[in-house]
């Protein structure tokens, strides 16, 4: 069944038959639909100047792309993909890498690889949506869904962002404790993260390119740190290759495998990427320019995610080599001591530097995600520092409670937050698939190919199936009582119904429920008549 989209406001400007109408709509909707582009949190109407300082000009974008790769053009598009890839390297990912290596050895490297491939596929849908339409995913959700489901979808997305932010707070606090030799307690590190993030907002004043370069340097620090750990630990290269290409997973390691998927493919990152790609200046009425933008965004994102995969692979391999079969309790908070005992004091501090860089990187991208999501869903303009204050304070409360009362539960909290991301993932995957499949939104030349649709639908069903397993496992771990199983079952029922609604749209969903109701009524009447007869 082809989903029906309720609004035609989002039709892309590359649709040649509607250029004039679209130009008018675009001019009329600037103030309402695009309150923020990228820089310094200034509304777009205040930035409408000739030189458009909030957009980055792309050389040769108006000419047909004669080369397979024009490196000047690629350089101009370099940035959004690396900012997007930071979510693949946040403290939640590092926690997942540690658990996978220590609990399963090299066996789950194939899960890491295919999770990254899946992530790339989904990020390309988000990127194409932003480039073709000039609107990001949250804005399309506001236009296409009615108020109540839209608000519920916003709450689910905010929950994912807050969950990720808790991991960033915990990761940074642990890194500070290690680097200070324990002189900075966890609770103080948690408070520190509430303040240090605001310094990044000042970088925006120097231009988006400076901000992108700064975060690329933090990614480089992570690569060097974990690369040194890899050299020190000397993992078995043959086992690493086998782990990437030979799929193995015992029943005991299913939770680690799901944790990898939840850590790598994060829902809020799909919303973020659809907005970041709009920082490059293109004419969306030009089919050539849109194609060039899609091509170079794809190349840059692929390169960035290859780097993120290598960094994660290095970390899994380090802990597989050193700790597989030797320990059952290891995480962000205890990894440094294990590394020091195994490889010396230098390994401990190198690990802390990499962890600190991961926490700082993901902090700012989380802020951007929250900003775009709030403005897109609620049409609410809010200064970045206010948005950061709200999100960070919300994340600090649970992190502070755990840091003060039970530091031993930090790693367990991180693992469950990764699983939370997996459960929330359909709330980003389903809308981006729906919108990029729509000819009304994407145009006939940029909508998804049918094969692409089938693949992403398969991924959605796979994610839902995994989440069913997680929910059942979680309920059995908490309690085997009938009331707990009932609560979990009811929760999952509404979870599944909401996903079905999002995938169909309101009109198709109402039509389906009406048919089911009529079928039920007809069967009831027939049964009643048979009894009377």
Curated annotation (Swiss-Prot):
Topology term for the membrane: Multi-pass membrane protein
HAMAP family: NRAMP (MF_00221)
Biological process terms in GO annotation: defense response to bacterium; iron ion transmembrane transport; manganese ion transport; phagocytosis; response to bacterium; response to imidacloprid
InterPro entries in the record: NRAMP_fam
Cytoplasmic side: 1-68, 123-158, 204-212, 278-302, 369-387, 437-457, 503-533
Name of encoding gene: nramp1
Residue positions the entry lists as glycosylated: 253
Keyword Ion transport: yes
Superkingdom of the organism of origin: Eukaryota
Any Pfam family hit: Nramp
Keyword entries, A-Z: Glycoprotein, Ion transport, Iron, Iron transport, Membrane, Transmembrane, Transmembrane helix, Transport
Extracellular-facing ranges: 90-101, 180-182, 234-256, 324-348, 409-415, 479-481
Disrupted gene: phenotype observed: More permissive hosts than wild-type cells for intracellular growth of L.pneumophila and M.avium.
GO molecular function: cadmium ion transmembrane transporter activity; ferrous iron transmembrane transporter activity; iron ion transmembrane transporter activity; manganese ion transmembrane transporter activity
Bias-annotated ranges (Low complexity): 14-29
Protein name as annotated: Metal transporter nramp1 homolog
Family: Belongs to the NRAMP family.
Chain residue ranges for the region called Disordered: 1-33
Transmembrane annotation, as ranges: 69-89, 102-122, 159-179, 183-203, 213-233, 257-277, 303-323, 349-368, 388-408, 416-436, 458-478, 482-502
NCBIfam families linked: nramp (TIGR01197), Nramp_1 (NF037982)
Function in brief: Depletes iron from the phagolysosome in an ATP-dependent process. May rather act as a symporter of protons and metal cations in an ATP-dependent process. Nramp1 overexpression protected cells from L.pneumophila infection.
